Curated annotation (Swiss-Prot):
Compartment(s) where it occurs, according to its Swiss-Prot or TrEMBL record: Plastid, Chloroplast
Organism (species): Euglena gracilis
Gene Ontology cellular-component annotations: chloroplast; cytosolic large ribosomal subunit
PANTHER family on file: 50S/60S RIBOSOMAL PROTEIN L14/L23, LARGE RIBOSOMAL SUBUNIT PROTEIN UL14M
Gene Ontology annotations of biological process type: translation
Single Gene Ontology MF annotation: large ribosomal subunit rRNA binding
Family of the protein in this entry: Belongs to the universal ribosomal protein uL14 family.
HAMAP family given in the database record: Ribosomal_uL14 (MF_01367)
UniProt-recorded name of the protein: Large ribosomal subunit protein uL14c
Gene name, Swiss-Prot/TrEMBL: rpl14
Amino acid sequence: MIKPQTYLKIADNTGAQKIMCIRILGPNCQYANIGDIIIAVVKEAIPNMVVKKSDIVKAVIVRTVKGVRRESGMAIRFDENAAVIINNDRSPKGTRIFGPIARELREKEFVKIMSLAPEVV
């Protein structure tokens, strides 16, 4: 569960390292789960990269500590909250994705992120 003011790690190579959620997109949303789009501000960034500190970005959540329950009854949880920065057309801004990605992103039509990920859980 990601709420506003939550810090997330970035799982791509855009240059941002940490972001803070400021808004969850969608009708009447109070918290976000895997596959939801958020608006965030960059809190830590590597210098001279695509994304700078204090930039406002859109991101899709790819890992949460709370996890997600599948129809088979299995629950998937991760060690950290992580997101991938995306463009307005829902394609990733970076060219590489780091760490495992949940399979639920395919249902939300983030196929490009799935293809860049090294491991799909």
